[in-house]
Each structure stands twice: as C-alpha cells, then as structure tokens.
Amino acid sequence: MLPTQSDRLLSYGDPQGEADLRQVLADYIRQRRNVNCSADDIVIGAGVQSILNLLCPLIHDRKTVSFPNASFVQGSTIFSDYGFEVQYRNKDCDVIYVSPAHMTKWGEIMPVSRRMELVHYAAAKGSLIIEDDFENEFVYFQRPTPSLFNLAGGHGVVYIGSFSRLLLPSIRLSFMVLPPSLSRKYAAVAERYSQTASKAEQIALCQFIRDGHLTSQTKKLKKLYAQKLKALENEVRNTFGSNCTIQTGAAGTSLALTIPYARTGLELKKEARMHGMSLLILEENAATITILLSCSSITTDDFAPACQLLSRLLNK
C-alpha cells in the first residue's frame, strides 16, 4: 500500500529532497528554462545558503570564486568559510557565480552573446559556472534568454533556483541542478547530510506545481510587477522631474534613482528610518546619490506619499 501524504510526514525526509518534488522540478525547469536534467541531478535545500553549503565540499579542489559584486554577502561568506578566495568580476577564477537575469539591482539582463562568450570561456579555462537564476520569472520587456546550463549542454554549470519571489520569503526552498561529474560526487556522500528543507513544505510545493498553480501564480505576479514597476517609474518622474536619472532593466521589481544630494547617505538613511522608510543606497559621491527603489513590498497607492517623503528628505 502506498503511503498517504500524512504518513509521509511521520518519517524523515530524503537527504537529497523528496523524490516526487525533484521529478516535478525537473519537468518544470525543462519546460520553463530548457534545463534538461533528471530528478537524480537535483538537490533541494532550505535556501541558497544551504545549497552552497552542500556544493562547496564537492568543489574543494578549486581555490578562487568570482562574484559580480560585493552585495551577495550570504553567498560569498559561505565560500570564504570553505577557504575560497573571493574576488569580484574576474572571469579567470576557478568558480564564477553569476545571476544572468539580475546583473544589476535594477534588473539588467545578460544578453545571449555575453552568455555564449562566458560559457565558451569557462569551458576553455576549466572553470565552473554557478548560475543563480534569480528573478528569471520576471522578465517583462524582452523574450526570456536561454539559461547558461542549457547553452553549456548541461556541463560545467550548476543551476540554482528558488521560490522566495514567487511564493513567500519565509518558505525556504531552493534547489540546484548538478552537472554529471558533480552529481556522481554528491551521490557518493548524500547520506552524510540531513535535509534542511521542511518535508511538509516540499510535499505542498510538489502538489502546488502539479496542479498548475505555480505557473498561474507566475503569470499573475509577472503582470502585476510589470504594471507596478511602470507606475513607480511614472511617479518618480512626476516627483523628481528632470532633476533625476532613472535606470531600469528588462526584469526585476526595482529601479535606480540618481539625484543631486550634498550630504552623506548615512544621514539620509537615518532620517528615512525615523519616518519608517528603509533605503538601499547603491552609490554616492560629493554631488549625487543613487538609491534603489522597489515596488514589490509597497502598494501602488503608497507610491506618491513615499516619493514625496523621499523628496522632502533629499531637499532638507
């Protein structure tokens, strides 16, 4: 007799992740991202950090890792803890960590030509690419570009996906697809590790995807965020006029606002916090400041009041 879903909750989970969820994910990313793999190549964990904690011992023979910038501290810290030398924007490193659909905080996407160049260069050097496909679901203004995993034919690339944007940040479920050489390495040591992701959440997500709800959710959120991002851009232009520069990409939920400002970003952040506003400052110099504005966790009705408050703080 096959176990019921309730019965499954009475046992420990598969260290690699629930088999049915791994199969559903293999089918899903094959259809959505043309990532061709088997369920045996997929490893599930509670967030990207957990995934990287499993990956680093498999690639301990490599010594250097490159990140696009210093903003992904959660990722670079894991590699540093395992003895990797962390560098930035250096394609000659042994490991290259990249998010092609999130090259900048405001959603610039790596073009296909650059992806092909990176895949070929890494293959020639023997480097491993880690493709974090963060926010690939939210590409609005151009056709989705192929994954690096697909362009590399499934070799020399580790593909990482997660669901924090599509579902809830509190649902800590991420996965990685290992190329054949690393998949064999992981299989030899899998039983040494415990599964970090909730078994109940894995079972629920599996059914959610099977029933078509994830595809439906993605379509709804993609439409919603595209509309909200455009509305935010319009509100920023209305508030700051020609005095500002706005940078937007083809994906994501944020834009970058550059505006004249003579004081320090630290002062601005402190004053903003006093008014209940949290600011992410991307860059500042003696004459201007660049701030990241996100539409994801604020209602459209609050765009105008938020922009007006920011304008007052900048002009104090």
Where are these regions (language model features)?
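Structural signature of PLP-dependent enzymes
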Residues: 186-190, 211-233
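Conserved glycine-rich beta-strand-loop-beta hairpin in the small C-terminal domain of fold type I
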Residues: 223-233, 244-258
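Active-site C-terminal subdomain of aminotransferase-like
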Residues: 182-201
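Conserved core of the PLP fold type I
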Residues: 3-126, 130, 136-138, 143-155, ...
